């Protein structure tokens, strides 16, 4: 696309070097068959980290849309980082995982001693302060950068023909004007999808009590739904472009009208990546969140990262390139993981029982004996983990037919 916007990012110097040279035969767009005249193109199968930021601007919202009141008027607010996540892709094994960063994480900013909320390091057109912040606090190197604003989100969702999400009950959020009145498989278009992934006061209808119940996991529940939506959107794109490089190119061209990428993430590399990851089963994609404990810093309610638990160390090792993506553990959420100051009521994973929460993972139980896990990529023995859950909050049901 002629309007493609690119930025320069810091190189991942000293990062994991796992390049496994191979080749693939180019596809002739005219016939859809392997080309017999062009030489094979080298494909980089190194596992890579993609920093994905979502920004909340008011552009591209139809003023006649039922969601315009919730998103359309953002004059004077600028663009803020509403979503921060790292997508790690391993083309060699067709594996993927996502690590999300709550925007209120209290961290050192841009390699300095000064602390602030992690989203204060965000600059849409210069991701390097955020990249430095992530490395300085979490030891994770970034290979590529993707910024998705409202326009890009709408374009991507609409380009794949909408994203289907299954619900066991009606759901709503009056703040974003989201209202799904019927249980079942619902297809989101771009604008309605925005209302869903941005929902912070997500409610579901309890038929027994005949009441609307709000997700007690608050912002972490929203993050879990964003991760689930991303997984479904990727699967929809893979399904739509399966075996057809022309459709894959069309989808990429549609997205590139609005997204901002690092200069090295060219359309050609995106097509190469799409081809290499075509067999990805997104139902196996692991999803994680940086854990933390709520606290007050002056008048600010922030989250102090909690990185020293065995489980969080094992999760970070995957994104640091010290453990194989295929060996990624499940995430064990500790009891106190909240954006609310300790002086207020804290909503934890045990606040609401699974019998009353649609799609919520069972609350942590007493710990079972742990087994040692060893990764083949290094000689280091990873800290042991025990599988309990890898998401929190009100989530869609697991319906493989809804995709």
Task: Locate each region found by the language model.
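Sec-exported extracytoplasmic/periplasmic mature domains
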Residues: 88-91, 106, 110, 123, ...
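Amphipathic, coiled-coil-like alpha-helical scaffolding segments used for oligomerization/assembly
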Residues: 118-182, 264-270, 280
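Second-shell loop/turn segments in exported
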Residues: 72-75, 115-124, 139-144, 183, ...
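Flexible, polar/acidic helix-loop-strand segments at domain edges
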Residues: 155-246
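Extracytoplasmic
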Residues: 45-48, 79-84, 93-101, 113-115, ...
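C-terminal solvent-exposed extensions
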Residues: 62, 114, 258-364, 382-403
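Entry/capping segment at the start of metal-dependent catalytic domains
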Residues: 1-93
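Soluble non-cytosolic domains of exported or imported proteins
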Residues: 77-81, 112, 120-129, 147-151, ...
């Amino acid at each position: 696309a002629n309007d493609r916007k690119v930025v320069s990012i810091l190189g991942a110097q000293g990062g994991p070097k796992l390049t496994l040279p191979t080749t693939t035969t180019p596809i002739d767009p005219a016939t859809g068959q392997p080309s017999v005249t062009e030489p094979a193109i080298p494909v980089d199968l190194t596992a890579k980290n993609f920093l994905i930021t979502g920004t909340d601007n008011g552009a591209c919202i139809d003023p006649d849309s039922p969601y315009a009141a919730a998103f359309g008027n953002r004059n004077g607010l600028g663009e803020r980082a509403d979503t921060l996540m790292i997508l790690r892709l391993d083309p060699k094994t067709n594996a993927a995982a996502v690590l999300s960063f709550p925007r209120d994480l209290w961290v050192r900013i841009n390699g300095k001693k000064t602390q602030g909320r992690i989203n204060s390091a965000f600059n849409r057109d210069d991701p390097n302060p955020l990249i430095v912040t992530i490395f300085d606090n979490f030891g994770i190197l970034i290979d590529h950068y993707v910024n998705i604003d409202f326009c890009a989100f709408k374009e991507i969702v609409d380009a794949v023909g909408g994203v289907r999400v299954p619900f066991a009950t009606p759901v709503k959020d009056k703040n974003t004007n989201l209202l799904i009145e019927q249980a079942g498989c619902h297809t989101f278009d771009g604008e309605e999808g925005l209302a869903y992934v941005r929902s912070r006061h997500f409610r579901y209808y309890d038929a027994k009590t005949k009441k609307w119940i709000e997700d007690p996991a608050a912002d972490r529940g929203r993050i879990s739904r964003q991760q689930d939506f991303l997984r479904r959107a990727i699967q929809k794109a893979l399904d739509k472009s399966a075996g057809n490089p022309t459709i894959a190119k069309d989808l990429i061209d549609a997205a590139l009208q609005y997204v901002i990428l690092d200069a090295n993430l060219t359309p050609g590399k995106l097509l190469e990546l799409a081809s290499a990851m075509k067999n990805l089963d997104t139902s196996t994609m692991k999803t994680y969140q940086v854990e933390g404990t709520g606290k007050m810093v002056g008048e600010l309610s922030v989250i102090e990262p909690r990185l020293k638990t065995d489980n969080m160390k094992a999760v970070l090792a995957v994104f640091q390139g010290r453990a194989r993506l295929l060996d990624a553990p499940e995430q064990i959420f500790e009891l106190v993981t909240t954006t609310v100051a300790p002086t207020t009521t804290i909503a934890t994973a045990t606040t609401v029982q699974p019998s009353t929460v649609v799609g919520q993972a069972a609350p942590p139980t007493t710990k079972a004996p742990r087994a040692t896990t060893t990764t083949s990529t290094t000689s280091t023995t990873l800290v042991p983990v025990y599988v309990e859950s890898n998401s929190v909050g009100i989530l869609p049901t697991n319906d493989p037919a809804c995709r």
